[in-house]
Amino acid sequence: MSEKFYRATYLNVNLDAILANYQNFNQLHANKTVISVIKANGYGLGSVKIAQHLMRHGATFFAVATLDEAIELRMHGVDAKLLVLGVVPTEDIEKAIQHRVALTVPSKAWLKETIKQIPDDNQKNLWLHVKLDTGMGRIGMKDIDEYKEVVDLINKRDHLVFEGVFTHFASADEPGSSMNEQYTLFKEMVNQVEKPIYIHCQNSAGSLLMDGQFCNAIRLGISLYGYYPSEYVKDNVKVHLRPSAQLVSETVQVKTLKVGETVSYGRTFIADEEMTIAILPIGYADGYLRSMQGAFVNVNGSQCEVIGRICMDQMIVKVPSHVKTGEKVILMDNHVDSPQSAEAVANKQGTINYEVLCNLSRRLPRIYYYDNNEEVTNELLK
């Protein structure tokens, strides 16, 4: 291990599982470029390590949400193509050019202001992907005339490159989806002007559920990490994904709770019998939220209930009497059918697996497993 950590709580990340998922989609869409979406710190798992591992195995294109995320990757030696999916402030355009980062064009107004910000003596290219709003209702242009004007403006300027056009599906992971309607509209709009190098509209759900031959690239997000976008998608595809993250802690104290005694804030749990409890050094500041009270965790093979309110840094679990200090506890597992799967955690929290992963705090050390290696990253000690 290259770094250390000083708390018995950590996140296991299997980079080989992520690579297997990437290769799976590479085969599924063999005639397309796979754009690996590693925004939000690689959905909480670590964008730098993920990018570095995928690049070692042939990945050439990544997408992030912000220019800051792109620059972070460049600072860590990621020299692959990078696309920022969000809107970059026009006053920061020179930074994008400096770091060779492709940007999203959300509107004609943004593009005109961007052109003003580019120095007259600039000799470096700025790659642009035009965003079309076909039904998501977020950034992007809905008007075909605006799209034509934007492409024309790009083509008239030296060092501006019309590299891509894309849209985003609003409900590709749901039954009775409007995905096909959006796809049809996207094709109609794109066909009105010359086609750029990259045409992409499929997210993870779209990549699993539709062929999308009009496009020559896909954006692989949640499924890159081994998770299905929804139960509907999981039930309607035959593609096997490998979940890559496991949240682990350890019992740091074991004690007996007598009848009538309480635990944690608000005294919401009152013992109705004598029982053994264990304290874990993990809390909602790590991403294991208060709504997980009443959930079950795996304490060395035993399913044990979370009792009392989860604190910022600690939580309490009811355990069998044989449990001792120092025993391993799995709070989120890397198996689809586990009672502690990311989906099970999401259901308990009343949310989706995306949010569960993204909530994983930076203070959690990440232990990366790849090519028979084990490497620790501790953001707090950098």
UniProtKB/Swiss-Prot annotation:
The protein's matches in SUPFAM superfamilies, at most eight in alphabetical order, are given as: Alanine racemase C-terminal domain-like, PLP-binding barrel
PTM-bearing positions, type N6-(pyridoxal phosphate)lysine: 39
Pfam families xrefs = Ala_racemase_C, Ala_racemase_N
The residues annotated as the active site are: 39, 265
Q: What is its EC number?
A: 5.1.1.1
Q: Which InterPro entries match?
A: Ala_racemase, Ala_racemase/Decarboxylase_C, Ala_racemase_C, Ala_racemase_N, Ala_racemase_pyridoxalP-BS, PLP-binding_barrel
The signal sequence is none
State any single GO MF term.
Answer: alanine racemase activity
What catalytic activity does the UniProt entry give for this protein? Answer: L-alanine = D-alanine
Task: Name one cellular component (GO) term.
Answer: cytosol
GO terms for biological process, alphabetical: D-alanine biosynthetic process; peptidoglycan biosynthetic process
Question: Would you say which domain of life the source belongs to?
Answer: Bacteria
- Which coenzymes or cofactors are required? pyridoxal 5'-phosphate
Instruction: Kindly list the positions annotated as binding substrate.
Output: 138, 312
Q: Which residues form a coiled coil?
A: none
| Protein keywords | Isomerase, Pyridoxal phosphate
What pathway does the UniProt record associate with this protein?
Answer: Amino-acid biosynthesis; D-alanine biosynthesis; D-alanine from L-alanine: step 1/1
Task: Kindly report, in one word, the top-level EC class recorded for this enzyme.
Answer: isomerase
| Protein purpose | Catalyzes the interconversion of L-alanine and D-alanine. May also act on other amino acids.
- Tell me which NCBIfam families the record gives: alr (TIGR00492)
Record-linked HAMAP family = Ala_racemase
Family to which this protein belongs: Belongs to the alanine racemase family.
Q: What is this protein called?
A: Alanine racemase
